């Protein structure tokens, strides 16, 4: 295709993207640069990945370490909004896509590429997330999505394609599960999960143990929160990524952070997935505990509205939008007073905030007791209740008059 001389491919080293490299070369007669975003996925997935890319036909392989930036600039802002998609999903895959796409775009512009390519299927959410980010950041770049273009439909087709071209690949014909991992979570789909009547086997879970296998003794962890961000574990200051990896290991041993959900994809289909977010689940519990102490009722309600809206923005691939920036700004303002310390108990798949304190706490033992009237005079409640219930009383009086045939709506 004319006008495309260099393509940057989001490369994972797996079967799909290994086949995409030669396919792009054959169909576009262009140089292919493989781009690998390290967002904290399994270390085995990155071993020898540059050599794999070159062996598949890439002229170059760029590996970018995005782990700290991912947690600091994408995970933490999302946490401050309180975003949870459809009540349970902590947006692990969704949060990683915008930083990968942004880094890809930067690489493409630096390398003088004309297009980017990805291995997302035409049935999933990720194609929208990647291409939405490109449209927002560099609309002049063309996007090539081979799964929407080629006639290969199965692992057998891909393996045969590579074999015919003498391209080495360690992938096998049988792949039970489809997995995606980053520093925040790991997702598993496929296999027995394709039937919602099947209970996930233990082979599904990678980072967490079952409640039955978890230790019989609880473990406690202390988190320090500053302006809505976790900054220390057991009084030890760590970087955001270090905090997350530490909590992943400790919480995973207790089976914390497992969910099995059937979610609504933005393309209209439902999909079932098992997600493990051990460290993130502990972080969320700590932040909610500090919020309970610090935020007044209307501010807490507003933060919950922000989270509900932001969950859809992130899930739907609209990170680089004015609305996203506005919600993050509002969440940051709310988080200014979210300072505190929380001790959490991890036990048999559950995490519970058992101790919490904040210098900005609105809770006071003195104010909450029933014995003291210096702050709260109980007699004042009568007037408040009469005003608070005024609309209800007017409605009831109107209904009573109508029931006996009277109409006093006119003066």
From Swiss-Prot:
ATP binds at residues 10-18, 37, 119. It catalyses: L-citrulline + L-aspartate + ATP = 2-(N(omega)-L-arginino)succinate + AMP + diphosphate + H(+). Its EC number is 6.3.4.5. GO terms for biological process: argininosuccinate metabolic process; L-arginine biosynthetic process; urea cycle. Its main location: cytoplasm. It is found in: Cytoplasm. InterPro entries: Arginosuc_syn_C, Arginosuc_syn_N, Arginosuc_synth, Arginosuc_synth_CS, Arginosuc_synth_type_1_subfam, AS_cat/multimer_dom_body, Rossmann-like_a/b/a_fold. Coiled coil: none annotated. It comes from the Bacteria. GO terms for molecular function: argininosuccinate synthase activity; ATP binding. L-aspartate binds at residues 121, 125-126. L-citrulline binds at residues 89, 94, 125, 129, 178, 187, 263, 275. The keyword Ligase applies. Pathway: Amino-acid biosynthesis; L-arginine biosynthesis; L-arginine from L-ornithine and carbamoyl phosphate: step 2/3. Keywords: Amino-acid biosynthesis, Arginine biosynthesis, ATP-binding, Cytoplasm, Ligase, Nucleotide-binding. The keyword Protein biosynthesis does not apply. GO terms for cellular component: cytoplasm. Belongs to the argininosuccinate synthase family. Type 1 subfamily. Homotetramer. This is Argininosuccinate synthase. It comes from Aeromonas salmonicida (strain A449).
């Amino acid at each position: 295709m004319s006008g495309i001389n260099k393509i940057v491919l989001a490369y994972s080293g797996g079967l799909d993207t290994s086949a995409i490299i030669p396919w792009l070369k054959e169909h576009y007669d262009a140089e292919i640069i493989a781009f690998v975003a390290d967002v904290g996925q399994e270390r085995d997935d990155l071993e020898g990945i540059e050599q794999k890319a070159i062996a598949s036909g890439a002229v170059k392989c760029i590996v970018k370490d995005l782990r700290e930036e991912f947690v600091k600039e994408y995970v933490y802002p999302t946490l401050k909004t309180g975003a949870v998609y459809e009540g349970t999903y902590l947006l692990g895959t969704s949060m990683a896509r915008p930083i990968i796409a942004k880094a890809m775009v930067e690489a493409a512009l630096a390398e003088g590429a004309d297009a980017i390519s990805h291995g997302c299927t035409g049935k999933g959410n990720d194609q929208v997330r990647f291409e939405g980010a490109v449209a927002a950041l560099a609309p002049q770049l063309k996007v090539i999505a081979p799964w929407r273009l080629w006639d290969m439909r199965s692992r057998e087709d891909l393996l045969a394609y590579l074999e015919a071209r003498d391209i080495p690949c360690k992938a096998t014909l049988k792949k039970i599960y489809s997995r995606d991992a980053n520093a925040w979570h790991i997702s598993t789909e496929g296999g027995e999960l394709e039937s919602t009547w099947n209970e996930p086997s233990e082979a599904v879970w990678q980072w967490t143990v079952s409640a039955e296998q978890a230790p019989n003794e609880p473990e406690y962890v202390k988190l320090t929160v500053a302006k809505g961000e976790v900054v220390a574990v057991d009084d030890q200051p760590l970087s955001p990524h270090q905090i997350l990896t530490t909590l992943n290991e400790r919480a995973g041993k207790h089976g914390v952070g497992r969910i099995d959900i059937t979610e609504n994809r933005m393309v209209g289909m439902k999909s079932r997935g098992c997600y493990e977010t051990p460290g993130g689940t502990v972080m969320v519990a700590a932040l909610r505990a500090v919020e309970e102490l610090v935020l007044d009722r209307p501010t807490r309600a507003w933060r919950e509205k922000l989270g509900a809206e932001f969950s859809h923005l992130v899930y739907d691939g609209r990170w680089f939008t004015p609305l996203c920036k506005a919600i993050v700004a509002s969440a940051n303002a709310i988080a200014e007073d979210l300072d505190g310390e929380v001790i959490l108990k991890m036990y048999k798949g559950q995490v519970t905030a058992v101790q919490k304190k904040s210098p900005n706490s609105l809770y006071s033992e003195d104010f909450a007791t029933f014995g003291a009237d210096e702050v709260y005079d109980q007699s004042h409640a009568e007037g408040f209740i009469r005003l608070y219930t005024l609309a209800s009383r007017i409605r009831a009086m109107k209904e009573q008059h109508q029931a006996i045939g009277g109409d006093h709506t006119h003066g």
